[in-house]
Amino acid sequence: MSTTNHDHHIYVLMGVSGSGKSAVASEVAHQLHAAFLDGDFLHPRRNIEKMASGEPLNDDDRKPWLQALNDAAFAMQRTNKVSLIVCSALKKHYRDLLREGNPNLSFIYLKGDFDVIESRLKARKGHFFKTQMLVTQFETLQEPGADETDVLVVDIDQPLEGVVASTIEVIKKGK
């Protein structure tokens, strides 16, 4: 049995909190009949308990989670033509762990500037938002460079429908 299907592809929607990863991935998955996984669902219990107590996760905490996402991507890619995973993937070495061993994985970076994302977060109903949380996300973000040729960029300074359409266009073009 083959372990990979080269006609199938995984797209990891990445970006800072508030960039629209979950909303975009959910709608794109619906329109393309693609598999969809919110990466947060695979956090180990220890990470969930740590976050619930207000402690930020460190790189050591994230490593088993990123490995679980890599395994999930591998499994999804075997049976689904297009699969979408939501994961902030803010640091290059996080992206390296996610792509390890899977040449059929690309990233879609939902890119927006601080002001655009801050205004969206403030507009969310029933969402507790602290500006410092977004500042920290941008400080942590290592924007993909030219050496990361598997990263596709979608500008999010447009309505959700436009971001969804741009994301679908990027997927249909391939890498």
Curated annotation (Swiss-Prot):
Pathway: Carbohydrate acid metabolism; D-gluconate degradation
Domain of life: Bacteria
Residues annotated as binding ATP: 15-22
Enzyme Commission code: 2.7.1.12
Keyword rRNA processing: no
GO annotation terms (biological process): carbohydrate metabolic process
Keywords, comma-separated and alphabetical: ATP-binding, Kinase, Nucleotide-binding, Transferase
UniProt cross-references to CDD domains, sorted A to Z: GntK
GO molecular function: ATP binding; gluconokinase activity; protein homodimerization activity
UniProt-listed InterPro entries: P-loop_NTPase, Shikimate/glucono_kinase, Therm_gnt_kin
Catalytic activity of the protein: D-gluconate + ATP = 6-phospho-D-gluconate + ADP + H(+)
Record Gene3D superfamilies: P-loop containing nucleotide triphosphate hydrolases
Entry similarity comment: Belongs to the gluconokinase GntK/GntV family.
Protein name: Thermoresistant gluconokinase
Gene that encodes it: gntK
